[in-house]
Amino acid sequence: LLSMVRPLKFILKFIFVTSTLAFIAGVAALYFEKQNQTVSRVYNELRPNLIQGGGQQCLSAMSTAGIKFVSLGDVRDKNCLIKNAIRINTLPNTKLSSPLTLNCRTASKLVTWLDEIEAKSIDHMGTYNCRKMRGSPIMSEHSFGTAIDIARINKASIKKHWDNGGVEGNYLHRAAKSAYSHFSNVITPDDNALHHDHFH
């Protein structure tokens, strides 16, 4: 009988310990979820106020540079806001796969960068899109018109050529290095799997 009691005590102790750990883990998960919700809510509310659209000075500079665009003013949609938004259908030196909708300041930086890397054409996967980041409650920079996803520059495909070490791959790495001097945030395939086929 004694030999049966000891295993029973062990089993009961094991159940108690695992139940306690599960409870603690559950409480911790709820805490961090609440913290994450609080942080994301504050960020989502404050982020639009920190964005600079460039104002009339930016619009004038774009016109002087020969950029054809449509001024959209401030574009609001739910929690999203583009300050001083513009839509660009064509660029003087770079063929676009589709029109761009960005805030003027970001568009100006993009045009300068494309000219610097001698981009004759780009295929992009989108600019403005009122959505959250994948797997996060925080709004994406696309929600504020401050981001573009580029899949191809000239004949160089990010998905096909980034890791091949050839002419196209070397060009893409130089282009990415150049982008860091123009944009505060640049994401490449080296950063995570979500960007295996494009620059952000």
Which residues does each PLM region occupy?
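Catalytic cores and adjacent binding grooves of peptidoglycan-active enzymes
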Residues: 13-14, 29-33, 70-89, 123, ...
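Membrane-interface motif at the C-terminal end of an N-terminal transmembrane signal
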Residues: 22-40
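Active-site acidic/histidine clusters and adjacent loop/turn architecture
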Residues: 44-123
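Mid-length scaffold segments of soluble, non-membrane domains
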Residues: 102-153
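N-terminal Sec-pathway targeting helices
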Residues: 3-21
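Non-membrane alpha-helical secondary structure
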Residues: 3-4, 38, 50, 54
